[in-house]
Amino acid sequence: MEQFDCGDCDLNDFIVHDAEAYSAAKLAVTYVMYAKANAKHVAAYFSLANDRVSLIDFESKTEFNRFRRHRFPNEKRLKSYPAVKLCRLGVDLADRKLSIGTFILNFIKSYFTRDNRTGCRFIT
């Protein structure tokens, strides 16, 4: 992992020094994608954590109510809704032109919408 470089110092540092600690503390889970041609080369990684969408995320209560009205029946209108947060996403500079970031975003979207593994409807 020491050779991973996505062009962002904070993202590079996280995968090398912090990802395991975040996982151990149950703050975020990091997934690593290795290159097909070289199983030791980290092509990309992403971290996920639990989140929520709530009233404080909107400019006004009216905006939040409009958001809820179009998505939930009246009896399911809560003050907050479960979500999954994409905390970090880094693609190694050597692999930038391979659409790996797009692949990861589509994977996350289908993982949580098609199979609905955690009962959430939103990705933040």
Enumerate the predicted regions with their spans.
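Short amphipathic alpha-helix that is part of the acyltransferase structural core
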Residues: 1-21, 25, 41
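Conserved beta-hairpin
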Residues: 26-47, 60-62
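Conserved GNAT acetyl-CoA-binding A-motif
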Residues: 105, 112-124
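Conserved acetyl-CoA-binding loop-helix of GNAT-fold acetyltransferases
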Residues: 97-111
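Conserved acyl-donor/pantetheine-binding loop and adjacent beta-alpha core of acyl/acetyltransferases
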Residues: 45-88
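Residue-level recognition of the N-termini of beta-strands and the immediately preceding loop/turn
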Residues: 29-31, 82, 120-123
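A short, internal acetyl-CoA/4′-phosphopantetheine-binding micro-motif in the GNAT/acyltransferase core
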Residues: 87-97
